[in-house]
Amino acid sequence: MTAITITDAAHDYLADLLEKQNTPGIGIRVFITQPGTQYAETCIAYCKPGEEKPEDKAIGLKSFTAWIDGFSEAFLDDAVVDYATDRMGGQLTIKAPNAKVPMVNADSPINERINYYLQTEINPGLASHGGQVTLIDVVEEETKNIAVLQFGGGCQGCGQADVTLKEGIERTLLERIPELSGVRDVTDHTQKENAYY
C-alpha cells in the first residue's frame, strides 16, 4: 500500500488535466522539495513517459500513473491529494503532515536525526523570539561528528546566541544523538538589525 491517498475527486480533476496535454501515457509525479525541513514544499508535476526516475514508485490509478519520488516517499506518509469545488471552480490541495518533520529512528542518517530534533524541539522555542536554526552540514573532525548550524531571524546577531547554542541546542542534540560530539555556529552575528537581544 502506498503512503499517499489521491481522492476520487482529485483523480478525476488530474485525469482531465492530463487528457488536455495530448501526450499518450502522461502521468503525474509527486515529490517534496527540501523534505524534512521547515522549507518543505509538496509538489505535483506532469510526468511524460521516460521522465520518471529509477527510484520512483509507480502507482497505477484508474486513468493514469502517479509516480512517487523515492526519496520523498517516507515524508508523504499520510498525505492526501484532494480536489474541492467552490464558486471559482475548484482547488487541488495536497496535505502532507509529515513533509516538514520526518519520523526518524536510530538507523536514520545523522543529518536527518539532527533536522528532526531541530524542527520538533529546538526551533519551536526559538520561534517565540522570531528565530530559527538550520543544519548546514555535518563534518567529521578527528573522528568526531560536528553539526554545523546557522542561526536566522531574531537569533542572528543576538547577544545570547552563544548561550543558546551551548546550553540549549548542543545539550539537546548531544542527549538525543550519541554519535554527535558537538555543534559549531557559522552565523555572521555582526548583522544585528533583527536581533532579539
Swiss-Prot record:
Parts of the chain that traverse the membrane: none
Binding site for [4Fe-4S] cluster: 155, 158
GO BP, sorted A to Z: iron-sulfur cluster assembly; protein maturation
Xref: InterPro entries: Fe/S_biogenesis_protein_NfuA (IPR017726), FeS_biogenesis (IPR000361), FSCA_dom_sf (IPR034904), HesB-like_dom_sf (IPR035903), NIF_FeS_clus_asmbl_NifU_C (IPR001075)
Keyword Cell division carried by entry: no
S-S pairs: none
Cofactor(s) required, per the database record: [4Fe-4S] cluster
GO molecular function, one term: iron ion binding
Cofactor note: Binds 1 [4Fe-4S] cluster per subunit. The cluster is presumably bound at the interface of two monomers.
Gene3D superfamilies: Fe-S cluster assembly (FSCA), HesB-like domain
Keyword annotations from UniProtKB, A to Z: 4Fe-4S, Iron, Iron-sulfur, Metal-binding
Protein purpose: Involved in iron-sulfur cluster biogenesis. Binds a 4Fe-4S cluster, can transfer this cluster to apoproteins, and thereby intervenes in the maturation of Fe/S proteins. Could also act as a scaffold/chaperone for damaged Fe/S proteins.
Family to which this protein belongs: Belongs to the NfuA family.
Subunit description: Homodimer.
Entry protein name: Fe/S biogenesis protein NfuA
Gene that encodes the chain: nfuA
